[in-house]
Amino acid sequence: MGIVWGWIAIAGLSDVSAQPVPPIAPDLPPLPDRFPATDDILDVPDLPSPDVSDPSQLTSDEAIAVREIRVLGNTVFSEEDLAPILSSYLGRRVSFEELIALRTAITDLYVRHGYTTSGAFVPPQDVTEGIVRVQAVEGRLEAIEIEGLERISDRYVRNRIRRASQPPLNLSQLEAALQLLQQDPAIDTVRAELTAGSAPGLSRLRLTLEEAFPLNGTLWVENRDSPSVGSIRGSVSLQGNSLLGVGDRLSGELGITEGVTEGFVDVAIPVNAQNTELRAFYRRVGSRVVEDPFDRLDIRSTEEEFRLGVMQPLIETPNREFAVGASLGLQRSRTFIFDDEPFSFSEGPEEGRSNVTALRLTQEWTSRSRYEVLAARSQLTFGLDLFDATSNDDAPDGAFFAWLGQFQWVRSLGGDTLLITRLATQLSTDELLPIEQFSIGGPTTVRGYLQNQRVGDSGVVGSVELRVPVLRDPGGWGTIQLTPFVDVGTVWNLGSDREVPSPSTLVGTGIGLRWELSQELSATVTWGIPLVEVSDRGDSLQADGIYFFIRYNPF
């Protein structure tokens, strides 16, 4: 085996080529299809205000000396909130018309803060002692009527609305909840009407919903993979939305190259009205080196990953989201030579075996407006010495800490021109096994280089890209965009004996052509120009900086 390793070293087979299961590039979530719409989906006709009754001891031509005003039934405003209104009526004689103005001012305060179905009135009372009581009637939702659902559970929709309709009813919060419901991929359209209920302050909400088709399928071809395992990949994915009728999501994907078969299944199920999600993820990869001359060594690998986790939104509005999550995952990787002989191509794995048990704490934040989208993601990973995790005294193993941060800014420059900036970084306090390292190079990080051209324990990668429409639906042939870009990335390792091959910093620039024939069919061709030369480029379309991506959505 020592002779084999020597031959591999002389031949210049890098760790990236030798590992058929390389690290996953630090991709950010996909760009939004569109900026959020601002159309109102809630119809609120004029609702009757609470009845105004005359105080029993006061007629329209009388006035009383007011020494105290008590607002009863109020749960929204503090004494400090009401003081500017009440102070102008205290310590003087007040007429009947002024009492009506007082209740109107309190009602207006409710309305200004979104409590449109709330108000105040002056009930019959004895005012001879100078104490005036104003009764607040705070609006409540009496009933929710839902029409149009067949597959989706009424309870799921009611829970989504009920979170924002707790008394007192705030129409701004209710409309935000309806907009979130409209963004649910399982629902196509939402129409809502608020009508008067059976008593003052009570309202009824009538929802008319149209369900979306529950399945989304995608087929695509691209040349994103390392040439060592076959760069051209064909993939198929299927996503199910609310198949169980409770807001659940099920997605699966299968991708195949000449040397790789990779598939995963991802499941998320909300378990309460606060939209807490339980998540499960499973991925399996089988790889084989097919690049000449190393294909003669029958180098292959397998990898399995399984994660269980929970995700909790803390802020959830149509324009802003913040969620935290935690997951426990197991990763098992095996590499072989001569088809079935365990073999390690880098420090850390034991006879080709890498086991990682990791606790991952995630924070995700998104902010949207009509003109821009900001997204950030932070992940703290703690490698645990559990479930047979790889353990070494003086080499990378399964006990480690790493932080991965990702940021994305999309800005509309007008005329459908977009500015897109991305930044991702991984910082590790420990030497990492290959399956946890950070990679740069390829169509999703630094264009102009091979996929995973450089790999390290820590790294930073960023890009700036413009998307400029040059043709809009010429003869019914869709939209064509030009996408000039600049990408920069660098990686480094811990330990002086584990230096990243020079150069460890990659810089690429170039231009792409995006063609969107329709919502179902699109294609992208990108030409990346490396500004920092590397010696290990190989011979492929990727080596020439050319990447393509063709996507078709049949449903």
Segments predicted by a language model, with ranges:
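Periplasmic polypeptide-binding modules associated with outer-membrane biogenesis and secretion
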Residues: 19-225, 236-237, 253-264, 403, ...
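Transmembrane beta-strand segments that form the barrel wall of outer-membrane beta-barrel proteins
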Residues: 192, 215-225, 236-242, 246-258, ...
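Residues that define the transmembrane beta-barrel architecture of outer-membrane proteins
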Residues: 201, 230-234, 259-263, 302-306, ...
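Repeated loop/turn-to-beta-strand initiation elements of outer-membrane beta-barrel proteins
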Residues: 215-217, 244-250, 273-278, 287-288, ...
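Membrane-embedded beta-strand positions of outer-membrane beta-barrel proteins
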Residues: 217-219, 238, 250-254, 278-282, ...
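Extracellular loop and loop/strand-boundary signature of outer-membrane beta-barrel proteins
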Residues: 223-224, 251-252, 292-297, 339-351, ...
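Transmembrane beta-strand segments of outer-membrane beta-barrel domains in Gram-negative
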Residues: 277-432
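C-terminal transmembrane beta-barrel domains of outer membrane proteins
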Residues: 391-555
